[in-house]
Each structure stands twice: as C-alpha cells, then as structure tokens.
C-alpha cells in the first residue's frame, strides 16, 4: 500500500494559504529632527516698579494647530514677548520707562483782593435817611405829608414824587403823574433843618395797593423818591452853573396800627456829571458817618490788632473793622470778613482827617 505525499502536501499548502493575510506596504516615513528647545529665560528679579507704567496687554494670537512628524508630536511655540522690564535675548535690551512720581497737590492760592482808596466828595445837601417820616395831614383827612431832617451848604429845592424811576443823568420820571404830580419846595442853606411838606400838598395812599408800596416795582420804580438839588452859581461868565443832586429812594410799610413807616433803600449822589451811590458803613457812629471814623476816638480800634484805628471797610458787607496794615495782610491770607465771615469782594480804605471840612 503506497502513501501519496503530494495530496497531503497540497492540502497543507491550501490550509496555510487560507490563514495568511496580505497587508499593504507601509508608507514611507520622514524622520525629521525635533526643533531645538527655546533658550532658557534669564533669571527674573522682582523689582517694585509701582510708579512705572506696564506695557499694554498683548493682542490675541491666532490658533496654531499641532503637527505630527513621524512618531514626534510637535506643538509650535508662540513667539516670546517681553515687557519693558525684561531683557529680550533676540534683540537689544529694552529699558523700563521711567516717569516722575506724581507731585503732591497744593492748595490753590487765595484770591487776590483789590484794595481801593476812598475819594472825598463834597455833598452840598444831605437828607438824613433815618429821619424820613410820613405824617398825617390834620387839615386833609386821609392824606400824608413827608418830613425829614437835612443839611445844606447852598440854597436849593426838594422834589417829592410817588412811584418814580431814575433815568440817565439822574433824571427822575414819575410813572403815574395823573394820580400824583411831583411837587417842588425851596429851602435855604443851613445845618440840621427840618422839612415838613405844607398842608394840602400831601397824597392819599389809598389809591395805591399796599403790596406795591412795600417793595420796588419792575425797572426800579420806587414808591417814594425825594430829590434834593442845589445849583452853584459860576465864578465867571465863561463857566456854567453846576448842579449837585441827592436822590433818596424808599419804600412804605404799613404797621399794625395803620400808620406808614418809611424805609430808605438807596441814596444817590449826582455831582458834576458823575453818579455815586451812598452806602452806610457798619461800625461807624453818626458823627463819623460821612468820614467813616468816630471823632470821639472810642470804639475805633481795629478788630485784628486792637491798636490802630480802623480805616478800611469790607465790601459788599460794608463792615468798617480793620486798619490798612491788617487789611493788606488779610487779603493775602483769607477772603472772609472778620466780622460776618462773608466773602470779601473789595476793600475800601478811608483816610480822612478830623480837620477836613469836606464830608
């Protein structure tokens, strides 16, 4: 009996071929050297640059995808940025920007106060503002007469007007002439005279509204205006006569008993074409009201140094309270009145001798 090896071998080869798998050849690989690592950072020293300005933040960088080279995975590094406080090894050394430290804030200087000297002006006629009254006319019921005390260096005249306003060149214009026409009265020179409006020339205040009598109306229309005027004769034929005028503007307030009280608001001087507005100075006496000083010498010391006579007034509060030396020091240190603590806008120095005849 013979054994055939050819069939067995063929069967074995077929079984072997059945279990073999054919794979495609591997693709070619490209082996590249990895990129060198970046140089190490230099040692960093923590300096306190609190006063230095740091560089602005970096702009956003575009996204960079990683690449695979063979068996090595390489992630590209973003470019290195250095602030001004770090050295750049790929370029020149960048120094930090030095700035001067902020200076301490200083207080603003005190406002400069202007100091002026008072100008002496002779007033030929003066109506004492605290003596102006309204008296009832006994002969004409319901009518009131104007009275006051005045001083005059020359002869002149008074003009009494109800509800009048001041126009250019100190001209007084009545607003209701049909109700009360202005009345003019002459006077002679002399000090301390009392004027009383003649009976029958008064006015009936019932024609006016009480609210209109107690305050100035629009465009500075005052309920009561007293104009005192003197005319100085020229010394020669070529000279013109000079008109000096004092205007007293007042309001009328009614008391509970029905009587009227006069409150003077403003007094104006018109001398040789120049307009002056009279203001009372607080701290002066009646005798020294014109010059701003008390002739008796009492109560005239400066409120700051308490030794020198006070000769400087504070505007607009009109407190006569300092000497000229203290006023010069005060205007460099403060702008507050030492009496009422209101802001000072101007200082008025008044230098008058007791022997001066002009007031």
From Swiss-Prot:
Please give the PANTHER family that the UniProt record associates with this protein: E3 UBIQUITIN-PROTEIN LIGASE LUL4-RELATED (PTHR22996:SF4), MAHOGUNIN (PTHR22996)
- Give the domain section of the comments: The RING-type zinc finger domain mediates binding to an E2 ubiquitin-conjugating enzyme.
- Record's keyword terms, sorted: Lipoprotein, Metal-binding, Myristate, Transferase, Ubl conjugation pathway, Zinc, Zinc-finger
Reaction(s) the record says it catalyses: S-ubiquitinyl-[E2 ubiquitin-conjugating enzyme]-L-cysteine + [acceptor protein]-L-lysine = [E2 ubiquitin-conjugating enzyme]-L-cysteine + N(6)-ubiquitinyl-[acceptor protein]-L-lysine
Which residue intervals make up region (Disordered)? 1-35
Q: What is this protein called?
A: Probable E3 ubiquitin-protein ligase LUL4
> Lineage from the top down?
Eukaryota, Viridiplantae, Streptophyta, Embryophyta, Tracheophyta
Name the segments for region: DAR2 domain.
Answer: 148-267
Lipidated residue numbers (N-myristoyl glycine): 2
State where composition is biased (Pro residues).
23-35
Q: Which GO terms describe its molecular function?
A: ubiquitin protein ligase activity; ubiquitin-protein transferase activity; zinc ion binding
Q: What does this protein do?
A: Acts as an E3 ubiquitin-protein ligase, or as part of E3 complex, which accepts ubiquitin from specific E2 ubiquitin-conjugating enzymes and then transfers it to substrates (in vitro).
Q: In which pathway does it act?
A: Protein modification; protein ubiquitination
Q: What is its EC number?
A: 2.3.2.27
The answer to whether the entry has keyword Ribonucleoprotein is: no
Its GO biological process annotations read:
protein ubiquitination
Name of the gene: LUL4
Where are the zinc-finger regions (RING-type) in this chain?
A: 302-341
Native species of this protein? Arabidopsis thaliana
Please give the superkingdom of this protein's source. Answer: Eukaryota
Report the top EC class in one word: transferase
Point out the coiled-coil segments of this chain.
Answer: none
């Amino acid at each position: 009996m013979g054994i055939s090896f050819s069939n067995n071998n063929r069967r074995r080869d077929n079984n072997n071929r059945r279990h073999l798998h054919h794979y495609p050849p591997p693709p070619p690989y490209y082996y590249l050297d990895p990129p060198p690592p970046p140089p190490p950072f230099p040692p960093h020293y923590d300096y306190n640059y609190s006063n230095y300005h740091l560089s602005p933040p970096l702009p956003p960088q575009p996204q960079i995808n990683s690449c695979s080279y063979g068996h090595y995975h390489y992630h590209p590094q973003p470019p290195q940025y250095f602030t001004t406080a770090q050295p750049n090894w790929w370029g020149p050394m960048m120094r930090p920007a030095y700035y001067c430290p902020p200076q301490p804030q200083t207080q603003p200087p005190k406002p400069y106060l202007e100091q002026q000297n008072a100008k002496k002006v002779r007033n030929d006629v003066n109506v004492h503002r605290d003596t102006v009254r309204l008296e009832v006319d006994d002969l004409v019921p319901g009518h009131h007469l104007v009275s006051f005390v005045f001083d005059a260096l020359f002869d002149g005249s008074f003009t009494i007007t109800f509800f009048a306003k001041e126009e250019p060149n100190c001209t007084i214009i009545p607003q209701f002439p049909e109700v009360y026409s202005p009345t003019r009265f002459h006077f002679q020179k002399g000090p301390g005279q009392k004027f009383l409006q003649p009976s029958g020339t008064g006015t009936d205040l019932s024609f006016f509204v009480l609210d209109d009598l107690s305050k100035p109306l629009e465009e500075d229309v005052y309920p009561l205006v007293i104009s005192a005027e003197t005319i100085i004769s020229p010394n020669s034929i070529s000279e013109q006569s000079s008109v000096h005028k004092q205007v007293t503007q007042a309001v009328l307030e009614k008391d509970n008993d029905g009587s009227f009280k006069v409150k003077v608001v403003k007094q104006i001087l018109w001398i040789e074409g120049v307009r002056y507005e009279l203001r009372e100075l607080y701290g002066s006496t009646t005798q020294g009201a014109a010059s701003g000083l008390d002739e008796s010498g009492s109560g005239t010391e400066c409120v700051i140094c308490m030794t020198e006579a006070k000769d400087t007034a504070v505007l607009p509060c009109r407190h006569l309270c300092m000497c000229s030396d203290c006023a010069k020091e005060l205007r460099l240190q403060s702008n507050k009145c030492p009496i009422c603590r209101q802001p000072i806008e101007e200082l008025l120095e008044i230098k008058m001798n007791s022997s001066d005849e002009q007031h």
